[in-house]
Amino acid sequence: MVSKADNSAKLVEGKAKPMGSFPHVKRAGDFLFVSGTSSRRPDNTFVGAEPDDTGRPRPNIELQTREVISNIRDILQSVGADLGDVVEVCSYLVNMNDFAAYNKVYAEFFDATGPARTTVAVHQLPHPQLVIEIKVVAYKPL
């Protein structure tokens, strides 16, 4: 049986507030579940969605992927874990044509001995400037 102390949820100070009623991270025993994370900043702007010369936002999969994984690392560190504790990654891409660029950045953080991974194409994410969202499961014994 999981005790109350082993089943905690947390919103992380300095990170964008979730766009719904859920925590950034939830502990269940020795496992940590990080909710779907994007490149959204606390001020509701997005890394990797800066405007081009015409003023239109141009989503950049590499910048967004790097920021998403950095946000996940910060969330994990807030509960005493790190990216090395991640055992499963599920990534959601709006455009599978971005897969190679996403994969390149992903490899900056994880190698072939890293977590199990699934990458899924989705029709859209909660904001039109977002092109990637990632959720992870980490194993960090109490």
Curated annotation (Swiss-Prot):
EC number(s) per entry: 3.5.99.5
pH-activity note: Optimum pH is 7.0. Stable in the range of pH 5.5-8.0.
Membrane spanning residue stretches: none
GO biological process, one term: catabolic process
GO cellular component, one term: cytosol
Regulation (activators, inhibitors): Slightly inhibited by Pb(2+), Hg(+) and Cu(2+).
Superkingdom in the source lineage: Bacteria
Hydrolase keyword on record: yes
Keyword Hydrolase: yes
Temperature dependence: Stable up to 55 degrees Celsius.
CDD domains: YjgF_YER057c_UK114_family (cd00448)
Keywords carried by this UniProt record: Aromatic hydrocarbons catabolism, Hydrolase
InterPro entries: RutC-like_sf (IPR035959), YjgF/YER057c/UK114 (IPR006175)
GO MF terms held by the record: 2-aminomuconate deaminase activity
Family: Belongs to the 2-aminomuconate deaminase family.
Entry function: Involved in the modified meta-cleavage pathway for the 2-aminophenol catabolism. Only active toward 2-aminomuconic acid.
Self-association state and partner proteins as the record states: Homotetramer.
The protein, known as: 2-aminomuconate deaminase
Source species: Pseudomonas sp
Gene that encodes the chain: amnD
